[in-house]
Design a protein with these regions (language model features):
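Active-site anion-handling motifs in enzyme catalytic cores
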Residues: 1-311
Length: 311
């Protein structure tokens, strides 16, 4: 039905170029997921439009149908491809993509934000902001229990109240209850944001933090974008690739052996790394400023490819 609505609408017909971008969407974690996204590219070509996969994160592709959809649509209907990491390029190649694939960077790090006054302005303690989500809750319950229990134990280590703890759900509908449960079971005093925030407000909150601890990729990228030292909990190659390309020296590994290595989350390791970043906050912020400026240059590749397509 949605596809028919799109055909009847003028969105594609009135456009000159159709860009499909974002991270994690082009993967067959759901059987029909590649088809559900790429069908719009086919539709765009039927209307004679130029098409581009813009700074995407791709893979994994584990089903024959998923690989077929990617191979068929990209080889026949895509004009330009930029990907944000080597791993994404490799997944496309393994699926049989023959088109040129250009490695660039994640455009989120180029986000600018206007400084705004928030209720969080006046702080007397160092602020640690957590961006957490219930990863693997449905797909791997035992690994999810490790994640939940490890995070509860980790948060309990801040019971001395020396730090201000702030929990920032990125997808409120999915993440809020998980964050609330972590706070309630750990018994600590913490603030929990309970509204969907726009990117500008989110970046202001991250900028006013002393360290960001994030499970979500874009929690890490947005922290880097506003110059706040961060501790990524890496559960997917997309986050690992970003950290590697940025040149950041901190990460905590956690995974089930599919999208990332098979490793339980260690609360003591998480706490020790958080404390180290806080102790080195000023030096790390200066280093991060240099690293993010270099990484931002990768976004120029995306724009250069787009300009070439526009010609």
């Amino acid at each position: 039905k949605e596809y028919i609505k799109e055909i009847k609408s003028n969105h594609i017909k009135e456009s000159d170029i159709i860009l499909l971008g974002g991270g994690g969407f082009l993967s067959d974690w759901s059987y029909f997921n590649p088809f559900n996204w790429l069908k719009y590219i086919v539709l765009a070509k039927l209307f004679g439009k130029k098409t581009m996969l813009y700074a995407i994160g791709a893979g994994p592709f584990r089903t024959k149908f998923g690989k077929f959809c990617v191979r068929f649509v990209v080889n026949n209907y895509i004009d330009k491809i930029t990907v944000r990491d080597v791993e994404s390029k490799d997944w496309l190649l393994k699926s049989g993509v023959k088109k040129e694939i250009v490695i660039s960077g994640d455009p989120v790090i180029g986000l600018e934000y206007e400084k705004s006054v928030l209720d969080l302005e006046n702080k007397t303690k160092k602020r640690i902001t957590f961006v957490l989500n219930p990863y693997l809750k449905e797909k791997n319950p035992s690994k999810y229990r490790n994640l939940e229990e490890a995070l509860i134990e980790y948060i309990r280590m801040f019971q001395d109240k020396k730090y201000e703890l702030l929990f920032l759900p990125f997808e409120n509908s999915k993440d809020f209850e998980f964050n609330k449960e972590i706070i309630d079971k750990s018994g600590v005093e913490a603030k929990l944001i309970n509204v969907e925030l726009d990117p500008n407000t989110t970046m202001n909150i991250l900028a006013k933090s002393d360290v960001v601890v994030s499970l979500r990729l874009h929690g890490n990228i947005m922290a880097a974008a506003c110059g706040t030292p961060f501790l990524p909990i890496v559960y997917h190659h997309k986050t690992a690739e970003f950290i590697k390309k940025l040149g950041w020296e901190y990460q905590i590994d956690f995974g089930e052996g599919k999208n990332w290595i098979d490793k339980d989350l260690n609360p003591q390791e998480l706490f020790d790394e958080t404390m180290e970043i806080l102790e080195k906050e000023i030096v790390l912020a200066e280093k991060l400023d240099i690293l993010r400026k270099e990484y931002k240059k990768l976004n120029d590749i995306n724009l250069d490819e787009l300009r070439e397509l526009i010609k």
